[in-house]
Design a protein with these regions (language model features):
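Active-site and channel-lining beta-strand-loop segments
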Residues: 19-42
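PLP-dependent aspartate aminotransferase-fold enzymes
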Residues: 86-175
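Short, well-ordered beta-strand elements within core beta-sheets of diverse protein domains
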Residues: 29, 47-50, 161-162
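Short secondary-structure boundary/capping elements
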Residues: 22, 53, 81, 163-166
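Active-site-adjacent loop/helix segments that line or gate small-molecule/cofactor pockets in enzymes
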Residues: 1-26, 67, 81-82
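Glycine-rich loop-to-alpha-helix module at the N-terminal edge of alpha/beta enzyme cores
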Residues: 8, 37-123
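Intrinsically disordered, low-complexity boundary segments flanking structured domains
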Residues: 1, 5-9, 70, 88, ...
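Short beta-strand-to-turn element immediately C-terminal to the catalytic PLP-Schiff-base lysine
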Residues: 31-32, 50-52, 143
Length: 175
């Protein structure tokens, strides 16, 4: 029932989604509504690096949720967790890196990187890699190296070229 409703009502991100009906997840495993466990090779950023329901993460979420869940994230309000994270990151970076641009997703980070690349270089050309995935916003789709996923959304950003992974010859395409 859940899988049928998922396939009927929710937009898919791939032609053939797994459609596993998730009941719970812990560590590297997802458990479906029938109790079958799956090793999660499709996890999101946090689950990928820390595992599902990592105790330190769930404790931090509970602690923070008692204060506030969300206020403007784009540099309008001083929030101790964000400021402390930025400060720690800056201490790890080269001296000429003085600030951190916080985003809520990978695709938003890609959009920020596109703008930064254009601003820093003064050029309009963008480089993507064949067989790459960066997200589903307009800019991220423009860099997507999977034609079947972006063909219906053309025209995309102009001046975009593609290189192959591990091809030194393709690096010459970057102007």
């Amino acid at each position: 029932m859940l899988k049928d409703d998922f396939l009927k009502y929710q937009a898919k991100t791939t032609p053939n989604p797994l459609g596993i009906s998730v009941a719970k997840a812990k560590g590297v495993y997802i458990t479906d509504t029938n109790g079958k466990k799956y090793l999660d090779f499709v996890s999101g950023v946090s689950a990928c690096s820390l595992g599902h329901c990592h105790p330190k993460v769930t404790r931090a979420i509970r602690k923070q949720s008692k204060k506030y869940l969300h206020v403007m994230v784009y540099g309008e309000f001083a929030q101790a967790p964000a400021v402390n994270l930025c400060k720690e990151l800056i201490e790890l970076l080269p001296e000429n890196q003085e600030s951190v641009y916080l985003t809520n997703s990978g695709t938003e980070a890609i959009e920020g990187a596109l703008k930064l690349a254009k601003r820093a270089t003064g050029r309009s050309e963008l480089i993507g890699a064949h067989q790459s995935y960066h997200g589903s916003t307009h800019g991220a789709l423009s860099l997507l190296g999977l034609e079947y996923q972006k063909t219906r959304f053309r025209p995309l950003l102009p001046d975009t070229r593609f290189i192959r992974f591990n091809s030194e010859d393709d690096l010459k395409l970057i102007t």
